[in-house]
Amino acid sequence: MQTTQEWDKVFPLSKSVSHRKVEFRNQYGITLVGDLYSPKSGGNGMALAVCGPFGATKEQSSGLYAMKMAERGFITCAFDPSFTGESGGEPRRTASPDINTEDFLAAVDFLSTLDEVDEGRIGIIGICGWGGIALNAAAVDPRIKATVASTMYDMCRVNGNGYFDESDSEEARYAARKAMAAERTEAARSGRLTQGGGVVDPLPDDAPQFVKDYYDYYKTGRGYHPRSGNSNDGWHTFGTQAYSNARFLHYINEIRSAVLIMHGENAHSRYFGEDAYRYMLEGNAPGYDAVRKPNPVPGNKQLLIIPGASHCDLYDGGYTEPEGKGQAKNMIPWDKLEEFFKTNLENTIEQ
């Protein structure tokens, strides 16, 4: 993929932050492209890797998070995951639990090589579907000392069980598997992949409110970007199939490092975060088939519910009127994120 050097984000560049494009490889040999943000006043040795939402690009919400945290002294890298945006990998618009988790670990690898970064003080932020991926990465890699999952989805659960677990039956999963198998056969015969479509457009009048919220972010000037799958033609029709038959948060009850899960009070996705938090602490929660031991280090785990906020309000803070107009609602608790990371990245003692 060709990389643009022009500023093409959906938000303006902060005057207090320096920015440059970077590239690094994951263990599968895929080149990932990121935006590195650095405070002009000098960093504090702490670094954050940021990704999400699922199907978005670094020019959207993850870039905003990265830039805002750089304003607060962190070296940050917002990156496009494999098969997405400016990063490499074929076929395009494909997702994989293992490769996506590896993408986060590769970003940690990259940050640990920078002279201005203390390799023992690295954290991650995952937004939407990448919130769940961030938890999986934290369960795998103890180099990650602090994790924020913002407005998270559990992509395995939603692909396997449907929204609100309404398709959690063998019959429903079998029907979905048959449909996906037919798509694969057709793709094999034709030699072409069919894109499944991003956020629905035109928007039906009777669409659920959360779909309207997605439309307002991805399809209008508020958050539209030409490289974003959600803003355009989406994943290919079986591009997320690998998530439907996996359960990748099995070991989050063993995360010893600090975790903050934050959700809007009115988010349709709130149950993903609340159930993940409970399972992470207790080893038992709705949506999780296993019953496991309680977390060995529960004291550094937090759940934050933001009053009045929707799912997409935590993408960019939200606005009082559609299309990013009106007054900014400022729903993202930047001070809380700064306090959480500085507290937990300053304490580098192994838990």
List the model feature ranges, each with a label.
Residues 2-42, 324-327:
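N-terminal cap/lid segment of alpha/beta-hydrolase-fold proteins
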Residues 55-67, 81, 273:
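The serine-hydrolase catalytic nucleophile loop
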Residues 57-58, 84-119, 322-333:
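Catalytic nucleophile-loop/oxyanion-hole region of alpha/beta-hydrolase
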Residues 68-88:
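Conserved alpha/beta-hydrolase
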Residues 116-128:
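Alpha/beta-hydrolase fold nucleophile elbow
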Residues 255, 261-263:
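Short beta-strand/loop motif that positions the catalytic acidic residue
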Residues 309, 318-351:
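Catalytic active-site module of serine/aspartate enzymes centered on a nucleophile-bearing elbow/loop
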